[in-house]
Design a protein with these regions (language model features):
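Alpha-helical transmembrane segments and their immediate juxtamembrane cytosolic regions
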Residues: 4-195
Length: 195
């Protein structure tokens, strides 16, 4: 006959982080980001379809705005648990470079390819955000400052919001309520203003 399990025991099992054999800071959240990445990719695809074919239907764009913070969260988790940040940055940087011409062709006026070459796609923003957070984690302040200055000064998608969100996710990794409050205070007002 099965034994009765108390609610507090079930809650404890569900909310206690699994033991991870790696050293470094621990997150009190689910580290399997594969499902989150799929959700972010689907949201991004819906956003791009809406932007290209149904620009007057705002719901496509709103759904798409879920993608960026999810990608920032996944990059923060990756930063904390990757074995080689340089390889991680290299892969992201290569993907940013390869996708740049397609980004310009898809989202900027035809015939102005060269004029829009410095409208950097979202992967450059994510690359610089990851680079900045790596600088913060390793106490290389100049690297953090350089990344923050670069995304804030030049024409990057989401500008400094990438570093801002990754900073919130990194610093509040074991304080989810504080992280959620800071996220709402920092990211959602930008969305309400039509970002």
């Amino acid at each position: 006959m099965p034994t009765a399990i108390s609610r507090s025991r079930v809650w404890s099992v569900l909310t206690t982080p699994a033991a991870i054999p790696q050293t470094g800071p621990r997150l009190k959240t689910n580290l399997d980001t594969d499902l989150l990445k799929l959700i972010a990719i689907a949201a991004m695809l819906i956003d791009h379809i809406g932007g290209a074919f149904f620009p007057e239907v705002g719901v496509f764009r709103w759904i798409g705005r879920l993608a960026f913070p999810i990608f920032c969260y996944c990059l923060t988790v990756g930063l904390l648990y990757t074995h080689d940040v340089r390889k991680y940055l290299t892969r992201l940087g290569i993907f940013a470079l390869v996708s740049q011409p397609f980004y310009i062709l898809a989202f900027h006026p035809v015939g102005e390819f060269w004029a829009n070459l410095t409208n950097w796609n979202i992967f450059f923003t994510l690359f610089l955000s990851l680079l900045g957070m790596y600088g913060l984690k390793e106490r290389k302040w100049w690297l953090f400052a350089l990344a923050l200055f670069t995304v804030s000064w030049w024409n990057f998608d989401y500008s400094g919001t990438g570093i801002q969100l990754m900073l919130i996710f990194y610093l509040c990794r074991n304080r989810p309520r504080l992280g959620a409050a800071l996220y709402l205070l920092s990211y959602l007002p930008a969305l309400m203003n039509g970002w």
